[in-house]
A protein has these predicted regions:
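Conserved SAM-binding strand-loop segment of SAM-dependent methyltransferases
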Residues: 112-122
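Conserved class I S-adenosyl-L-methionine
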Residues: 65-73
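Conserved SAM-binding motif I beta-strand of class I
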Residues: 89-94
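Short, conserved SAM-binding/catalytic segment
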Residues: 104-114
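Class I SAM-dependent transferase core
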Residues: 5-64, 109-110
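Conserved SAM-binding loop of SAM-dependent methyltransferases across substrates and taxa
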Residues: 74-86
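Single conserved hydrophobic/aromatic residue that forms the stacking wall/gate
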Residues: 123-131
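Short alpha-helix immediately C-terminal to the canonical SAM-binding loop
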Residues: 99-101
Length: 131
């Protein structure tokens, strides 16, 4: 099934604009993936559409407030949540500059004003809490 069919078969109530944003997002992943290795090269658009829907289901289970997507990669689930709930504040974190450059592009392309990105490496340090 393609994205529109998957959304129609689901319980999601997305506007035409949100469906268009989701479709553009998936197309941009495939386009950028040719040079930036965002996702597996074996993934097709219908695979990404299913992944989008899997991420969309999270929305129902989130409490109100901001969300941090650690190791976001190509933006799953952060960008998906930004499309579905454009008022929710989202911070996408990844250490790979190729991926964060894609995130900047897609945020601007889709007009996701509540989404911000961080390019950093997360690590743990010794602390009293760890002992």
């Amino acid at each position: 099934m393609d994205l529109k069919e998957l959304i129609a078969a689901s319980s999601l109530n997305l506007t035409d604009i949100q469906v268009s944003q989701a479709d553009k997002y998936l197309n941009q992943i495939l386009k950028w993936n040719k040079t930036r290795n965002l996702v597996s090269r074996n993934l097709r658009k219908n695979d990404l559409a299913e992944h989008f829907l899997d991420c969309a289901v999270l929305q129902k289970h989130l409490m109100p407030g901001s969300v941090i997507d650690l190791g976001t990669g190509s933006g799953f689930p952060g960008i998906c949540l930004g499309i579905i709930d454009p008022k929710r504040e989202l911070t996408l974190v990844d250490s790979n500059r190729k991926k964060t450059s894609f995130l900047i592009h897609i945020k601007n392309e889709l007009g996701l004003n509540s989404v911000s990105k961080k390019n950093c490496l997360l690590y743990t340090t010794d602390s009293a809490d760890d002992k």
